[in-house]
């Protein structure tokens, strides 16, 4: 057992355009990414002064066919904002991949998240890993697939391409309804209900199951999640029992920095108190830091949740880490902590 009492925090910022099913002719700006660069660059000094440790973020880039077709090259987010990337690398941040499976369908005159087409999904991965290698002259270690989605075949493909850490899986998460029309997706979400909440090496036959016999290969580092049962007044509870019973059931809450404070704090405290080796994986879309917001409370929540983290009683134990640094701190990479047993 590793006696290190440091608590790693992996801060994943998904670097994306300011939209989803974007216009190929009139490309959306990446104002959110520009805002994220400003915000997290300024935040870094505060984190380091508060925790007493260097702060390293994980920037997860869209280097995929939608970006290539819309902006002229899969490498565009890196080459267009090269000074940002240089700054991140200088400060020890992780450059990771965040591919989506958007495919342009002429008949629909729209993009489709073609998650049900494994050949296309593999193509998206290969494009991203190839672009990454050209840009950085090394293999990408860390990735998290888009649209809350991953599959066994996709993790196996990423491993073949050289990935060491996957940060996609959100334990307990089951989305019953997509944010956009169902016909814009070619596959349902996987069932994350029984996925471990601590890092594990996945079975090559079923990514949701740990394979404790594996001694090498990719690690799944689950995003931090928990279940929250929201409380309502007696009359409101009665109404919900009749008209919307799902609303009084426990809900899965992800440590997304843009989430409302109550759910974020409850899950954070539960994780810190229950995991054998506590760690946090927080996520955020870059567009939350921009101007074209679908929910104007998102940046307010982000700042309040960051304040909560940095005013926490355990803050001196927090270390904002890359995936590899976090796994080393927790003892997984040197074999002092068993994997996939929670």
Question: Where would I find each of the regions flagged by the language model?
Answer:
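Well-ordered, non-membrane alpha-helical segments in soluble/globular domains
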Residues: 29-44, 74-82, 121-126, 257-269, ...
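A structural motif corresponding to the C-terminal end of an alpha-helix
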Residues: 39-55, 83-94, 131-139, 207-218, ...
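Active-site beta->alpha N-cap acidic-glycine motif
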Residues: 1-87, 91, 309
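Metal-dependent polysaccharide deacetylase catalytic core of the NodB/CE4 family, i.e.
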Residues: 55-57, 62-149, 227, 285-287
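C-terminal domain-boundary segment and adjacent tail
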Residues: 242-342
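Short catalytic/ligand-binding loop motif for oxyanion handling, primarily in non-cytosolic enzymes
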Residues: 18-21, 66-70, 103-107, 149-154, ...
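Hydrophobic faces of well-ordered beta-strands that scaffold small-molecule active sites
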Residues: 9-13, 57-59, 95-98, 141-143, ...
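Active-site-adjacent pocket scaffolds in enzyme catalytic domains
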Residues: 145-276
């Amino acid at each position: 057992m590793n006696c290190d009492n440091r608590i790693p925090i992996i801060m994943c910022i998904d670097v994306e355009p300011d939209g989803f099913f974007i216009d190929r002719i009139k490309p959306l700006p990446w104002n959110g990414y520009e805002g994220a660069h400003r915000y997290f660059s300024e935040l870094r000094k505060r984190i380091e002064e508060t925790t007493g440790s260097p702060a390293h973020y994980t920037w997860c880039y869209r280097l995929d066919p939608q970006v290539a077709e819309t902006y002229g090259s899969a490498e565009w987010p890196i080459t267009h904002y090269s000074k940002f990337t240089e700054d991140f690398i200088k400060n020890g941040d992780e450059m990771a991949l965040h591919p989506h499976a958007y495919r342009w369908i002429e008949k629909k005159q729209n993009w489709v998240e073609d998650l049900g087409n494994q050949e296309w999904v593999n193509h998206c991965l290969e494009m991203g890993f190839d672009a990454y290698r050209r840009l950085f002259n090394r293999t990408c270690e860390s990735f998290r697939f888009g649209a809350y989605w991953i599959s066994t075949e996709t993790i196996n493909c990423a491993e073949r391409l050289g990935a060491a850490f996957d940060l996609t899986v959100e334990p307990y998460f089951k989305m019953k309804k997509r944010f956009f029309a169902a016909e814009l997706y070619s596959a349902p979400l996987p069932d994350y209900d029984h996925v471990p909440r601590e890092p594990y090496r996945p079975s090559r036959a079923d990514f949701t199951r740990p394979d404790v016999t594996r001694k090498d290969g990719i690690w799944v580092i689950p995003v931090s999640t928990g279940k929250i049962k929201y409380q309502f007044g007696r009359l409101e509870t009665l109404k919900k029992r009749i008209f919307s019973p799902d609303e009084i059931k426990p809900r899965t809450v992800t440590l997304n920095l843009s989430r409302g404070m109550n759910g974020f704090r409850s899950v954070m405290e539960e994780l810190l108190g229950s995991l054998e080796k506590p760690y946090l994986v927080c996520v955020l879309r870059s567009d939350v830091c921009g101007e074209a917001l679908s929910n104007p409370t998102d940046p307010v929540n982000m700042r309040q949740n960051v304040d909560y983290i940095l005013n926490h009683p355990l803050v001196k134990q927090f270390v904002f880490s890359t995936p590899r640094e976090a796994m080393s701190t927790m003892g997984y990479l040197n074999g002092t902590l068993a994997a996939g047993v929670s």
